[in-house]
Every structure is written in structure tokens, then in C-alpha cells.
């Protein structure tokens, strides 16, 4: 009903979608829950139709710096903390995407100082351009293999968060992630070991463990 109000001429299809609908379509914004193996999307790819995420559409319209967070675990917590940190620093921010408010719904709110996006591997895979100010990759474990088929495909989607980043935060304890990390951007690492240089880690001082930098 809301869509009909916004665009009365839009055609709405409910249930199974016939491949005949593909005629005349140049782009599909697909739900992240639908895999590329779905017959409709598979047919779209076969016909050379671009399939993108809502995030791709969002970044084309957003006019404030973006901070993107991904990882198998902890991304919702970190996204929420970053939002609270902005508030404590006197900066306005809006958090969403894979957490809470859908990314496109953030665009109808007042422009913030920062957008903080939690991104899933599904969203990252279908997002070609991701010009973020800071990209954060927390960790990667075998997950969502029903969607990505292999762990390497899953990792490839996660690593895409760095593709257009100005700066990045990454887990140096993941050797594969370190190997795929771009060397031409500013970076900050973290880990459970002692920090060495520009990063955070844990130091043991006479039995007391401290979070330490440098």
C-alpha cells in the first residue's frame, strides 16, 4: 500500500515471479536473503541484467562519510558501540543496514555527520562500489556456506569491504585476512597478542593483562 502511494504506476508482483518480467529490466535490487542460484536471479544473470544490493543504491545517494563494519561475530556490537561513541563525541550518526534500520530508510532522516553500517557478506557480494571512510573487518569463521557455497567465496565477499576504503581496521590474527589486506590504505590492526607498531593488543604485566596500543 505504501509503495502504491509513492509510485502509483509501479507494477507489484507477489509470490513466484515469472522470468517474463525480466523483459525491459536493466537492474534488480535483490534482497540479501535470496541467493544467486534462485531461478529468477540466475535468469537475470544469464540475460546480463545487473543484480545489486540495497547498499549499492544507498552509497550512491548518501552524502555523509561512511563507516562500514563486517565480521562473522560481533559486528552488531561494534556498530552499536561506534554509534554511541559518535554521540559521546558530540557527532551525529545513524546506524543501520544489516542492523535495525534498513540502509535506504536512513536516507529519509536528517543528514548525520556519519553513517555507520553493519554489512553482511550477502550485501557485500552484491555491492560493487563501496567508498567508505573506514572499513572494519572483525573476524571470519565458516558461516553461511549454504549461500556462498565455499568458505573462500564467503571470505572473498567479506574482503570486499576494503575495496574502496580510505582507512581500515583488521584482525591481524587471521593470516588469510592479512594476506588479502590492501597495503595502499591507512590501517590499524588488533589482536590477542602483544601489539607491534600501529595496532592494539594485550600485554601481560606481572600477571595483569592490559589492552595496549603500539
Language-model features, listed with the residues they occupy:
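Conserved catalytic and cofactor-binding micro-motifs
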Residues: 6-9, 199, 203
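Active-site loops of AMP-binding adenylate-forming
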Residues: 107-108, 193-195, 213
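N-terminal beta-loop-helix "entrance" segment that forms/cooperates
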Residues: 1-8, 102-105
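Phosphate-binding loop of NTP-binding sites
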Residues: 19-24, 32-172, 176-186, 201-204
Amino acid at each position: 500500500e505504501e509503495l502504491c502511494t509513492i509510485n502509483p504506476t509501479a507494477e507489484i508482483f507477489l509470490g513466484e515471479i515469472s522470468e517474463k518480467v525480466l523483459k525491459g529490466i536493466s537492474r534488480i535490487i535483490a534482497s540479501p536473503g535470496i541467493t544467486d542460484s534462485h531461478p529468477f536471479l540466475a535468469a537475470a544473470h544469464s540475460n546480463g541484467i545487473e543484480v545489486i544490493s540495497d547498499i549499492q543504491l544507498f552509497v550512491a545517494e548518501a552524502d555523509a562519510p561512511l563507516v562500514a563494519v563486517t565480521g562473522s561475530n560481533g559486528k552488531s556490537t561494534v556498530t552499536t558501540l561506534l554509534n554511541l561513541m559518535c554521540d559521546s563525541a558530540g557527532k551525529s550518526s545513524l546506524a543501520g543496514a544489516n542492523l535495525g534500520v534498513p540502509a535506504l530508510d536512513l536516507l529519509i532522516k536528517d543528514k548525520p555527520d556519519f553513517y555507520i553500517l553493519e554489512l553482511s557478506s550477502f550485501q557485500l557480494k552484491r555491492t560493487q562500489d563501496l567508498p567508505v571512510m573506514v572499513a572494519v573487518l572483525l573476524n571470519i569463521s565458516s558461516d553461511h556456506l549454504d549461500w556462498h557455497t565455499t568458505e573462500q567465496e564467503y571470505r572473498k565477499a567479506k574482503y570486499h569491504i576494503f575495496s574502496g576504503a580510505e582507512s581500515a581496521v583488521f584482525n591481524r590474527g587471521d593470516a588469510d585476512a592479512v594476506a588479502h589486506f590492501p597495503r595502499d590504505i591507512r590501517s590499524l590492526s588488533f589482536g590477542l597478542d602483544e601489539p607491534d607498531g600501529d595496532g592494539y593488543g594485550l600485554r601481560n604485566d606481572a600477571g595483569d593483562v592490559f589492552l595496549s596500543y603500539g
